[in-house]
């Protein structure tokens, strides 16, 4: 269970980073 939760957290962080990159690209 801990492994799945850790993987989900990592995926969430990656999604946030991609979202910020998209925002920066949209502003530029």
Curated annotation (Swiss-Prot):
Record localization: Sarcoplasmic reticulum membrane; Cell membrane, Sarcolemma, T-tubule
Keywords: Cell membrane, Membrane, Sarcoplasmic reticulum, Transmembrane, Transmembrane helix
CDD domains: Sarcolamban
Disrupted-gene phenotype: SclA and SclB double mutants show arrhythmic cardiac contractions and correspondingly, cardiac cells show irregular action potentials (APs), involving double and occasionally failed APs. Calcium transients in these mutants show higher amplitudes and steeper decay than those in wild type flies.
Iron among keywords: no
Record text on subunit structure and interactions: Interacts with SERCA.
Name this protein carries in UniProt: Sarcolamban A
């Amino acid at each position: 269970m801990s492994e799945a939760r850790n993987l989900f957290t990592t995926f969430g962080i990656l999604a946030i980073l991609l979202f910020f990159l998209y925002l920066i690209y949209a502003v530029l």
